[in-house]
Structures are given as structure tokens and as C-alpha cells.
Amino acid sequence: MIYNDSRRRDVCQMQYKTIYKTPRGFSDMVMMSDGEVLTGLHFVDSRKATRSCRDCAAHDLPVFRETCRWLDEYFGGHAPSFTPSYRIDGLTPFRKDVIDVLLKIPFGQIKTYGDIAAAIAKKRGMKKMSAQAVGGAVGWNPICLVIPCHRVIGANGALVGYGGGITNKVALLAHEAR
């Protein structure tokens, strides 16, 4: 579930985090929440995790248990059968369009930044759109895996531009290809 809230959140609102221990071959993940819904999911060694979690309190929440079940299904080699509750703050119309396309990329498949740009251009009645702009929006994604930004590759098939690190991207794509 996406809540489009482009207003700045109350800076005093409590934020929570917990760590998900991934299977061998992947970095562990940090989950973040406002106490009700998932607000972030990143690999622990990513810059986003370091920046986003500075003042988060460790806590066990229902949304974390729900997200753990989703991650267990994912790392178990299956397309998860549900989506954990989440909210994305600061979602512009363009970012929403990009996320909508990302959410439609099936488990085990990939798209290029150009494919996504073409889909959005078509939806908006434009001749073309910048693949670089799409890359910026994909890189902005605060909830990796659930919103599958790792399934996006460069036009020449290059595995580029993944905030969770290229090693994790390679491992995720190989995991989904099995």
C-alpha cells in the first residue's frame, strides 16, 4: 500500500528498526517503521541504511514480523504471496509512475531503465522520456526488494546503479533465476 505524502513528516515522530538476518550470500537487511507500516528496507551496508537509521530505536513490531514473513518467502525462492504494509514519503508523481512500473516486474524477470522510461512516456502520451531520470527515481526507492529496483539493468545488460551494492544485486538476480 502506498501513501502519497509529499509533506515533510514530523521530525519528532518515533522511528523503529530491526535487523533481518538473510541467508548466506546476501548482506543482512534493516527494516524501518513509524510503528505502524514499513517505511524503509535496505541492506545494512548501504549508505541509505546508515543515513536513515541513525536515530531509530530497536523494536519488535507486527509490521516487522509481517515483513520477515515476506522476506522468508522471497529468500525461500518464491515470489511472495502478499505485500507488507508500507508507506513512502516524498513520493512525486514521477516517482510514483516509476514505482508502479517496478511493482509490475515479475519475480525472476528484468527490465532496462529505457524500458521503464518508454512505458512511462507511453502512459503520459509522450514520445520519449529520459532513462537517466528513471535511474534517479529507481535509485531513490526507500523499500528495496518489496519494490524490486534490483530487477532494473542498463541498456547493454550491465548491472549498474544499485544502492544495495552490485554484489547484492548480482546475488538477488541469480537467486531469482533459479
Language-model segments: which ranges?
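Low-complexity, small/basic-enriched stretches
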Residues: 1-83, 154-178
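Nucleic acid-binding interface residues in structured DNA/RNA-binding domains
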Residues: 15-26, 78-178
